[in-house]
Amino acid sequence: TDCGILQRIKVKQQWAQVYSVGESRTDFAIDVFNNFFRTNPDRSLFNRVNGDNVYSPEFKAHMVRVFAGFDILISVLDDKPVLDQALAHYAAFHKQFGTIPFKAFGQTMFQTIAEHIHGADIGAWRACYAEQIVTGITA
């Protein structure tokens, strides 16, 4: 599956469902990170944001930043020049952290989306996340 226009629309629509407003955003982010840490228990990458406690104010602030970034990237999936600039910014920023498990995080996010949305198009998520976001952010 490619990240074509239909897949981008599905991803944007499903993101709007799962990451709607207010407290549900935090709840979704906590679900994603709890699922991620179950299969990727090494939290050393998150030491400076109190990664041992996903409920701490420091880690909640980190989650807000991470998911705000996803929100930006997903909102511009269909605007290639803006998407490319946003990805270049995030790629430059993340270089300071060394190797980041973007693929594993994506798999966890897909699983969590499927838990929150019946009939989620995980193929579209995999394609757009792998082809656009991971490829761009690791460039």
Swiss-Prot record:
Q: By its UniProt entry, which Gene3D superfamilies does this protein fall under?
A: Globins
In its UniProt record, a GO molecular function of this protein is: iron ion binding
**Any idea which UniProt keywords this protein has?**
Disulfide bond, Heme, Iron, Metal-binding, Oxygen transport, Secreted, Transport
One GO cellular-component annotation of the UniProt record comes to: extracellular region
Domain Globin intervals: 2-139
Q: Which InterPro entries match?
A: Globin, Globin-like_sf, Globin/Proto, Haemoglobin_extracell, Mb-like_M
Principal localisation: secreted
User: Where is the protein found, in the record's own terms?
Assistant: Secreted
Between which residues do disulfide bridges form?
C3-C128
Give the domain of life: Eukaryota
Per UniProt, heme b binds at H94
- Write down the Pfam families for this protein, in alphabetical order: Globin
- Tell me which family the UniProt entry assigns to this protein: Belongs to the globin family.
Q: What quaternary structure, including any partners, is listed in this protein's UniProt entry? A: The giant hemoglobins of worms are formed of a monomeric subunit and a disulfide-bonded trimer. This subunit is monomeric.
Name the UniProt record assigns to this protein: Extracellular globin-1
- Organism whose genome encodes this protein: Tylorrhynchus heterochetus
